[in-house]
From Swiss-Prot:
GO molecular function, one term: structural constituent of ribosome
Chain's gene name: rpmH
Coiled coil: none
Protein name: Large ribosomal subunit protein bL34
Keywords: Ribonucleoprotein, Ribosomal protein
Family of the protein in this entry: Belongs to the bacterial ribosomal protein bL34 family.
Region (Disordered): 1-44
GO CC aspect terms: ribonucleoprotein complex; ribosome
GO BP, sorted A to Z: translation
Biased composition (Basic residues): 1-22, 29-44
Length: 44
């Protein structure tokens, strides 16, 4: 049986990367929350 998660670095970056987050207002809210929380890594 085929496993459901077939990781690809490019796809992860395209979907959850910093530039994708910055491109929408809600994405920027995500980054803001993660900064306030003190996350070392903000995005993929």
């Amino acid at each position: 049986m085929l496993r459901t998660y077939q990781p690809k670095k490019r796809h992860a970056k395209k979907e959850h990367g910093f530039r994708k987050r910055m491109s929408t207002s809600n994405g920027r809210k995500v980054l803001r929350r993660r900064r306030l929380k003190g996350r070392k890594v903000l995005s993929a």
